[in-house]
C-alpha cells in the first residue's frame, strides 16, 4: 500500500515508516506489518497480529490484535532471516476501504502489550490502487540438493 504514516509510535517513540502491508495466512492469522524508517536498523519491523478479523461494512475491516510481532537486526536468525519476538497484546486495527476494489484509504491500529508498551499506527493512502499478491506454500521443487 502506498501512502504515509501520519503516526507511528512505539512506547512513546515516534518513527516514520517505509512500507505498510497486510498479510493473511491460510491458517487464519492476519497482520498489518510496518517497516520502520529507522536509519540505525533496516530490519526494524513491527506487525499488529490477530486471528479474529471481520468486515463490519463493505468498506470497513476490523482486526482484533492479540499479539505484536517485533523484529530488529538484533533478533536471532533462521535461514538468514530475523525471527520476530512475540508480545501478547490487546488492541484493534481498522482498515477503511475495500480489498476487492483495490481501494484502501486508511489503517488505524492501537495495541498495548502485557508489559504496558503502547503501539500506534495511523496510515493514510495516497489514493493509488493497492497491489494484491497471493502467496501459497508449496512443496520444494528440488528433489536432490547437489551441494550436500
Identify the meaning behind each predicted range:
Residues 1-62:
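An ectodomain-focused feature that recognizes extracytoplasmic/extracellular
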Residues 12, 91, 138-140:
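Glycine-centered flexibility motif
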Residues 21-23, 35, 80, 96, ...:
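Short, well-ordered helical secondary-structure segments
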Residues 38, 52, 67-69, 111-113, ...:
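A mature extracytoplasmic/lumenal domain signature
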Residues 47-71, 75, 80, 132-141:
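A signal for specific C-terminal beta-sheet/loop modules enriched in small/flexible residues
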Residues 64-121:
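Acidic, glycine-rich flexible loop segments
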Residues 101-148:
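C-terminal partner/receptor-binding element of secreted or periplasmic proteins
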